[in-house]
Design a protein with these regions (language model features):
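Interfacial segments of alpha-helical transmembrane regions
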Residues: 60-84, 150-151
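Membrane-embedded catalytic cores of phosphoryl/pyrophosphoryl-handling enzymes
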Residues: 107-257
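Alpha-helical transmembrane spans of integral membrane proteins, capturing the lipid-embedded, hydrophobic core
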Residues: 3-4, 54, 74, 78-86, ...
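Hydrophobic alpha-helical transmembrane segments
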Residues: 48-67, 123-138
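Alpha-helical transmembrane segments
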Residues: 1-8, 77-81, 155-156, 214-219
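Hydrophobic alpha-helical transmembrane segments of integral membrane proteins
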Residues: 72-101, 161-169
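Membrane-helix interfacial "entry" motifs
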Residues: 34-45, 58, 62, 66-70, ...
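N-terminal transmembrane-helix/juxtamembrane module of multi-pass inner/ER membrane proteins
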Residues: 1-55, 87-114, 253-272
């Protein structure tokens, strides 16, 4: 992935014309965009929301109740992901597809994005940040077909979610590749950061749990307001907001009572 990023950068800067970045992958983009248009637009508009950092953290907030270090790894990775995304977008300033292609050539779902901040895809970066942070904590050394199936399934799901950015007409294919690569780095950094804190099993208790419940409740309220202000109210936003509200309530009342589970998921023992 890093080789692809380097090659694209050299090619574009060598020509001295930022529009060449889109020209290199115009046919790829149009082919994929048209192929994905066969699925209902509402599916893609909801799937693409899962690349929103607030939505992803809210939907996965139940991890706080059972595997808090995994959720903490995602939260810890967020600043790295944000910094990588903002820096790269400003540095490359690549035009989005709708900025250089004729409107009749592409299928756009939602608003047509025309800014010069296409590279990398922030959604792809967020998706892979979350996935890699989770896998690095829960399955740091996959063993056995079950665990490898989880890894493969996670990567497949992440790939589909990334493709939603092409489906809605927001990103070029290489935006997704670079975003995924940077997200991989951010996810590993978040997981490494989470390992430096030893108090995860008790993070739901006492003042820490109550403070965390306030944060999660605030996230829930923000998402529910956003859903109400976005007709017709994307189900992904409502689901994320309600999930976070339920987790905030659980934290407030101290449920579940038992301590959090160990972060690493072990392979079931084989019968002798």
């Amino acid at each position: 992935m890093l080789i692809v990023l380097t090659a694209v950068t050299v090619e574009v800067l060598g020509h001295g014309d930022l529009s060449d970045y889109g020209a290199l992958q115009r046919d790829w983009f149009i082919t994929i965009n048209h192929a994905l248009a066969s699925a209902p637009g509402q599916i893609w508009s909801n799937l693409t929301l899962l690349g929103d950092g607030a939505v992803l953290l809210a939907l996965l907030s139940p991890l706080i109740l059972w595997r808090p270090q995994a959720w903490g790894a995602m939260l810890g990775a967020a600043p790295f992901a944000g910094a990588l995304s903002a820096t790269a977008k400003h540095w490359f300033a690549m035009p989005r597809p709708a900025a250089v292609l004729d409107p009749q050539q592409i299928n756009v779902i939602g608003d047509a994005l025309t800014a010069h901040n296409s590279l990398p895809s922030g959604h792809a970066l967020t998706i892979f940040t979350g996935l890699i942070a989770l896998l690095a904590v829960l399955l740091p050394r996959p063993a056995g077909w079950r665990q490898w199936s989880v890894v493969a399934g996670g990567l497949l799901l992440a790939g589909v979610l990334c493709l939603s950015r092409i489906a809605v007409g927001a990103h070029w294919p290489l935006d997704l590749v670079v975003g995924a690569a940077l997200g991989w780095v951010a996810g590993l950094l978040g997981a490494a950061l989470s390992r430096r804190y030893a108090g995860w099993p008790q993070v739901r208790r006492g003042i820490t749990g109550r403070c965390l419940s306030v944060v999660i409740l605030g996230l829930s309220i923000a998402l529910l307001i956003r859903a109400a202000d976005t007709p017709p109210g994307p189900p992904a936003l409502w689901l994320a907001g309600i999930t976070a509200a339920a987790v905030a309530f659980c934290l407030l009342v101290g449920w579940p009572r038992q301590p959090a589970q160990p972060s690493v998921i072990s392979e079931p023992a084989r019968p002798g």
